[in-house]
């Protein structure tokens, strides 16, 4: 199936990938060149893992996971495969986010620095917890086969909306964290004196993160770029059979079945429409 505005989609996708990749590179250069590198010894070098893993996992990889269903060349792949890729990318992002949080707590504890006192830490921890819950719920309901279509239909809009909200919260938290780190780290020269690290480099990193988030938001909210419903879906009916079978072999009304009441016909049509709606929701259980 051809995608409407395909070249515009490719341009935005390419821009998002470029900006996201630059965000990761800028973060690495920041900690390796300006902040003395990486380590795992409780020092500031361990803390430096926090921005690296957060930008790489919680920002960049999560952004890709959000739009993976909108890649038109994947529409021929099975929905189960795409769900697995979506869940796998989110799982990688979650693991990196958890490791980055551990690095912060270990650094603070070793150096007797208070934990969880800033707005950045509050919002960031809430985002991580909500993300883990979102990942668990999505895996349980949309990837495993046990959940009925009615449950998927009910949870699908919540899953989509909460995913977008969490991603937006992560972008805002990253911007707060970058600013907070600069204020705490830049003493001589101070941040307010326009040092190259802060004004010309890390501020640019913040803008890259913001632009990446905006591009992901735009791509994921365009209805014309949404993965189409699979045409060969099979819908079970209360009376047995499938929607495909019902469409392909409608009963030939003769003298034996012409006496079916209008109410029975209406009930059958209503049940069929209800199952179609549930199937539509179940097939589009992701963004």
Curated annotation (Swiss-Prot):
Cofactors? heme b
Could you give a single Gene Ontology term from the biological process aspect?
A: multicellular organismal-level iron ion homeostasis
EC numbers on record: 7.2.1.3
Ligand binding (heme b 1): 50, 115-118, 120, 180
Entry note: cofactor: Binds 2 heme b groups non-covalently.
Keywords per UniProt = Cell membrane, Electron transport, Heme, Iron, Membrane, Metal-binding, Oxidoreductase, Phosphoprotein, Translocase, Transmembrane, Transmembrane helix, Transport
As for subcellular location, the record says: Cell membrane; Apical cell membrane
Where is heme b 2 bound in this sequence?
A: 70, 79, 86, 159, 226
The residues listed in the UniProt record as binding Fe(3+), with positions renumbered to this chain, are: 108
Chain residues that bind L-ascorbate: 79, 83, 152
Could you tell me the superkingdom of the organism this chain comes from? Eukaryota
Give Gene Ontology CC terms. apical plasma membrane; brush border membrane; lysosomal membrane; membrane
Top enzyme class of this protein? translocase
Residues bearing Phosphoserine are: 233
Extract the PROSITE patterns matched here.
CYTOCHROME_B561 (PS50939)
What is the catalytic activity of this protein? Fe(3+)(out) + L-ascorbate(in) = monodehydro-L-ascorbate radical(in) + Fe(2+)(out) + H(+); Cu(2+)(out) + L-ascorbate(in) = Cu(+)(out) + monodehydro-L-ascorbate radical(in) + H(+); monodehydro-L-ascorbate radical(out) + L-ascorbate(in) = monodehydro-L-ascorbate radical(in) + L-ascorbate(out)
Record PTM Phosphothreonine, positions in chain: 286
Question: Cytochrome b561 domain: from which residue to which, for each copy?
Answer: 15-221
Q: What is its main location?
A: membrane
Task of the protein: Plasma membrane reductase that uses cytoplasmic ascorbate as an electron donor to reduce extracellular Fe(3+) into Fe(2+). Probably functions in dietary iron absorption at the brush border of duodenal enterocytes by producing Fe(2+), the divalent form of iron that can be transported into enterocytes. It is also able to reduce extracellular monodehydro-L-ascorbate and may be involved in extracellular ascorbate regeneration by erythrocytes in blood. May also act as a ferrireductase in airway epithelial cells. May also function as a cupric transmembrane reductase.
Q: Which PANTHER family match?
A: CYTOCHROME B561-RELATED (PTHR10106), PLASMA MEMBRANE ASCORBATE-DEPENDENT REDUCTASE CYBRD1 (PTHR10106:SF12)
What name does this protein carry?
Plasma membrane ascorbate-dependent reductase CYBRD1
Q: Which source organism?
A: Pongo abelii
């Amino acid at each position: 199936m051809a995608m409407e505005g395909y070249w515009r989609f490719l341009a935005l996708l390419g821009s998002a990938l470029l900006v996201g990749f630059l965000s990761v590179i800028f973060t690495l250069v920041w900690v390796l060149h300006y902040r003395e590198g990486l380590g795992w010894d409780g020092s500031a070098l361990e803390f430096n893992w926090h921005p690296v893993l957060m930008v790489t996992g919680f920002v960049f990889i999560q952004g890709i996971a959000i739009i993976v269903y909108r890649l038109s060349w994947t529409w021929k792949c099975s929905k189960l495969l795409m769900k697995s890729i979506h869940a796998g990318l989110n799982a990688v992002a979650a693991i990196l986010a958890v490791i980055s949080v551990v690095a912060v707590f270990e650094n603070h504890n070793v150096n007797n620095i208070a934990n969880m006192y800033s707005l950045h830490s509050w919002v960031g921890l809430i985002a991580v917890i909500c993300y883990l819950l979102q990942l668990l719920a999505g895996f349980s309901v949309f990837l495993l086969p046990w959940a009925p279509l009615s449950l998927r239909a009910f949870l699908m809009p919540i899953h989509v909306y909460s995913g977008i909200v969490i991603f937006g919260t992560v972008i805002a938290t990253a911007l707060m964290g970058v600013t907070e780190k600069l204020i705490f780290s830049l003493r001589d020269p101070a941040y307010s004196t326009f040092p190259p690290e802060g004004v010309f480099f890390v501020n640019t990193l913040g803008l890259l993160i913001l632009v990446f988030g905006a591009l992901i938001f735009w791509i994921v909210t365009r209805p014309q770029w949404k993965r189409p419903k699979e045409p060969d879906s099979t819908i079970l009916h209360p009376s047995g059979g499938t929607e495909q079978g019902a469409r392909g072999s409608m009963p030939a009304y003769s003298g034996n079945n012409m006496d079916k009441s209008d109410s029975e016909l209406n009930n059958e049509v209503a049940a069929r429409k209800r199952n179609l709606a549930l199937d539509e929701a179940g097939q589009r259980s992701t963004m």
